[in-house]
Amino acid sequence: MKTTIAEVNQYVGQEVTIGAWLANKRSSGKIAFLQLRDGTGFIQGVVEKANVSEEVFQRAKTLTQETSLYVTGTVRVDERSPFGYELSVTNIQVINEAVDYPITPKEHGVEFLMDHRHLWLRSRRQHAIMKIRNELIRATYEFFNERGFVKVDAPILTGSAPEGTTELFHTKYFDEDAYLSQSGQLYMEAAAMALGKVFSFGPTFRAEKSKTRRHLIEFWMIEPEMAFYEFEDNLRLQEEYVSYLVQSVLSRCQLELGRLGRDVTKLELVKPPFPRLTYDEAIKLLHDKGFTDIEWGDDFGAPHETAIAESFDKPVFITHYPTSLKPFYMQPDPNRPDVVLCADLIAPEGYGEIIGGSERIHDYELLKQRLEEHHLPLEAYEWYLDLRKYGSVPHSGFGLGLERTVAWICGVEHVRETIPFPRLLNRLYP
């Protein structure tokens, strides 16, 4: 019976065949222990000299790391194993022998591992991170589908910059200038006027010359946009969504969290409501903590976000930023036009901003004024202005950065481990 490691619990006491790679091995006299992986999980294969032919036993002792195999054996319960089962091996068939696999069980430097990212993905740690990333994506689709959202795909090539910045990757679109997308938000606003509640999930590109542990050049964003949602509606949805993601990982990825050594007691606290600070209150909190390098009107850096997060055991909203700090499309607070109806959600434990969101301007004249204040060409945004001319309504949305969210939930220090093939300031390979 051919099966996978994830399904061996269905075949206890039965003989099965698994296609796998040899992650590691050790031998002791008349017994060999094979650490096998097949993508669905890890299992130990036990080869006892008394139970196999001499040829099979010698083959087991000489197998090299990452050799691909068909391994046949009887499934046994093993309470000592994190997985709960082991394979009592009866036969081994080599598919392809791996010679001089570069990533040995010893410690390796980060640059070496990044040069071999295509192989580093095979490790237990990276396997766990990718499985948790996948669970966040699965849970995202489940969350929004259950709430009546429609998945809409935004273009990667655009003729304008949603944030109105210069941090763009430029390319030629035949005879026109084009840019790699920084966000699908503007297109989601158009889609929300047609479909009510929508979300996009795709790659975004920022030509930021940042080398911090929080920054990637290419990263993935989940961007919902909702017609008839005002500021408070938006915050409640964000709380619900982030809590849903965390609880899904806690319930479905226990093995992976354990493999990463993640303290799940901190994640168990992530349930609505989340604490809130206005920008004004956040500035005061930082001053009270002794920060002298920030005043009203300044944006927060990583040390500031970390200091704010340390005051709470859940993600915290920072709301009502100065209008001057935020993009042109954010709705000013009607009671105080110098701030906008926006919020950044700061993750605990120093992982920084994972969500940025706001209520959007829905008045044509105000949006046009804001575009002019930001010195953006009106002709490039004519279609976006049209949304305010033809049945505009209050609407809101947000963007969640997948990689920072993965880093926080997994408890990994750097976002380079949270995406299969990271694109960094100094890295475009492999």
UniProtKB/Swiss-Prot annotation:
Keywords attached to this entry: Aminoacyl-tRNA synthetase, ATP-binding, Cytoplasm, Ligase, Nucleotide-binding, Protein biosynthesis
Gene: asnS
Disulfide bonds: none
Location within or outside the cell: Cytoplasm
Catalytic reactions on record: tRNA(Asn) + L-asparagine + ATP = L-asparaginyl-tRNA(Asn) + AMP + diphosphate + H(+)
Principal cellular location given in the protein's record: cytoplasm
Name of the protein in its database record: Asparagine--tRNA ligase
PANTHER family in alphabetical order: ASPARAGINE--TRNA LIGASE, MITOCHONDRIAL-RELATED, ASPARTYL/LYSYL-TRNA SYNTHETASE
Family membership noted in the UniProt record: Belongs to the class-II aminoacyl-tRNA synthetase family.
GO molecular function, one term: catalytic activity, acting on a protein
Record-listed E.C. numbers: 6.1.1.22
Pfam families in alphabetical order: tRNA-synt_2, tRNA_anti-codon
Summary of subunit composition and partner proteins: Homodimer.
Gene Ontology biological-process entries: asparaginyl-tRNA aminoacylation
Gene Ontology CC annotations of this record: cytoplasm
